[in-house]
């Protein structure tokens, strides 16, 4: 993590208007049309796995949100997953380690929340394998998964101890369990 990060805080401590402004700056105001938004439509982000990065001047420079979603197998049975993202950093502060710090905070929180003798839920995201691979995300388990909108299959990445038990085929969408 960069020395630039002064503080990682729970995302729920940040004004939602500031979060939306940061996301617009990082991804553009048309970001709501992206497939990731369709996958998590109608869901509230998971506060225990969502964080904000403040720089040394206590300015908001990054956010990470996680969402409850499901992979529905061909028979329609839902399997719960956590969708990671967006991982957003303001453009002028990218490549300073803020995204890495946010990912590390989320994975640490996920490990603390894990139940004894039970694997944590698998995580999925749409992103660059070269970046997210350092945390074990891979496109290998998602080859038969589909999304409700356009996406590059090489960018649909997943990680988790229980991926072998996941359906090989299915559609990602909001958790409705």
Model-derived segments and spans:
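Short, solvent-exposed loop/turn elements at beta->coil junctions and helix N-caps
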Residues: 36-42, 143-146
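Conserved beta-strand in the GNAT
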Residues: 50-52, 59-72, 80-88
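Non-DNA-binding regulatory cores of transcription-related proteins
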Residues: 141-159, 166-177
């Amino acid at each position: 993590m960069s020395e630039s990060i002064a503080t990682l805080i729970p995302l729920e401590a940040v004004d939602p208007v500031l979060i939306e402004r940061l996301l617009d700056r990082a991804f553009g105001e048309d970001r709501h049309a992206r497939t990731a938004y369709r996958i998590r439509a109608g869901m509230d982000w998971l506060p225990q796995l969502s964080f904000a990065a403040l720089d040394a001047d206590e300015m908001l420079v990054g956010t990470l949100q996680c969402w409850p979603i499901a992979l529905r197998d061909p028979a329609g049975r839902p399997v719960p997953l956590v969708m990671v993202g967006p991982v957003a950093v303001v453009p002028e502060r990218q490549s300073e380690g803020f995204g890495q710090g946010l990912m590390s905070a989320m994975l640490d929180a996920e490990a603390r929340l894990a139940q004894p003798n039970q694997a944590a839920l698998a995580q999925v995201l749409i992103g660059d394998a070269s970046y997210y691979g350092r945390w074990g995300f891979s496109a290998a388990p998602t080859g038969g998964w589909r999304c409700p909108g356009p996406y590059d299959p090489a960018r649909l990445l997943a990680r988790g101890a229980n991926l072998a038990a996941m359906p090989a085929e299915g559609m990602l969408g909001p958790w409705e369990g």
